């Protein structure tokens, strides 16, 4: 079994863990390969570009926060990802630093389970060619630097849902419901629910609220504005600048993400400890 290792090189603790992990693998003659930037920063090898790492490994290890895990999962495709939290929140990264070796040993023994998470797929045309972008958390179309309030036109399966005058629109998966969508007033949704949530960003309308829809729907979004360019971000990464009236479609991706599960944690505990959900000032839920 070979492991692909992706490290948040901006965090010294993540680099320290990576060195420790490489030594641990070497002592046990276990195969591993770093993502190129991680390997060059550490001065360790072998390494390969992130786009090629999937061809050389069976399991991925993410050493960083949720952003590192999102980046890793996009390139892992369906291969298992062990998320070690060396970040601030660590909502998606299942394991603490002290649990790293136990998690790896579980995978080596085959005695592990997976959390399979659905993704969305955004389709846009660039130079006349269709491009697909996957996201585990969300796709966000926003006004960017446009100085006025545009209207975001949303259709479901070809039928008009509404026109939102807002700073942007978030289309989130159930996994992504606790990310940007939640910050914009969207609901918390259990991670294996087969739904999308459509959340407007700062809508200039008192009657507009987030809406939850089945993830078997095809969502079409365009921007009604006389001019300007509007950024499309998938999991926080800029994918395209949309012109007025240019349409993107969003649907459930056929590719799911497999996260190695930490069976010591449950979703309610994660909400309470990471988001302080339901906690009163006296700490009665601690």
Curated annotation (Swiss-Prot):
Biological processes, Gene Ontology terms: NAD metabolic process; NADP biosynthetic process
EC id: 2.7.1.23
Phylogenetic lineage: Bacteria, Pseudomonadati, Chlorobiota, Chlorobiia, Chlorobiales
Record carries keyword Chaperone: no
GO MF annotation list: ATP binding; metal ion binding; NAD binding; NAD+ kinase activity
Top EC group: transferase
Keyword terms, alphabetized: ATP-binding, Cytoplasm, Kinase, NAD, NADP, Nucleotide-binding, Transferase
Name the UniProt record assigns to this protein: NAD kinase
InterPro entries recorded: ATP-NAD_kinase_N, ATP-NAD_kinase_PpnK-typ_C, NAD/diacylglycerol_kinase_sf, NADK
Name of encoding gene: nadK
Catalytic reaction list: NAD(+) + ATP = ADP + NADP(+) + H(+)
SUPFAM superfamilies tied to this protein: NAD kinase/diacylglycerol kinase-like
Membrane-spanning segments: none
Cofactor(s) listed: a divalent metal cation
């Amino acid at each position: 079994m070979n492991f692909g290792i992706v490290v948040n090189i901006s965090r010294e603790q993540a680099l320290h863990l990576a060195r420790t992990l490489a030594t641990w693998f070497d002592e046990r003659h276990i195969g591993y390969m770093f993502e190129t930037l991680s390997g060059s920063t550490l001065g360790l090898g072998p390494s390969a570009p992130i786009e090629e790492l999937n061809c050389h490994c069976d399991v991925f290890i993410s050493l960083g926060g949720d952003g590192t895990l999102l980046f890793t999962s996009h390139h892992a495709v369906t291969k298992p990802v062990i998320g070690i939290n060396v970040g601030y929140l660590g909502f998606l990264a299942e394991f603490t630093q002290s649990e790293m070796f136990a998690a790896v040993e579980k995978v080596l023994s085959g005695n592990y389970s997976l959390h399979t998470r659905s993704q969305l797929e955004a389709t846009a045309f660039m130079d006349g060619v269709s491009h697909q972008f996957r996201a585990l958390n969300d796709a966000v179309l926003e006004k960017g630097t446009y100085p006025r309030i545009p209207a975001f036109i949303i259709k479901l399966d070809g039928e008009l849902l509404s026109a939102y005058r807002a700073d942007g629109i978030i289309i989130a998966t159930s996994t992504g419901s606790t990310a940007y969508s939640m910050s914009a007033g969207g609901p918390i949704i259990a991670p294996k629910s087969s739904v999308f949530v459509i959340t407007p960003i700062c809508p200039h309308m008192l009657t507009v609220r987030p809406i939850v829809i089945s993830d078997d729907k095809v969502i079409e979004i365009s921007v009604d504005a006389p001019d300007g360019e509007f950024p499309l971000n998938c999991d926080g990464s800029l994918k395209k600048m949309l012109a007025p009236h240019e349409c993107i479609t969003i649907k459930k991706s056929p590719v799911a993400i497999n996260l190695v599960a930490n069976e010591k944690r449950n979703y309610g505990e994660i909400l309470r400890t990471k988001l302080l959900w339901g906690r009163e000032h006296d700490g009665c839920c601690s």
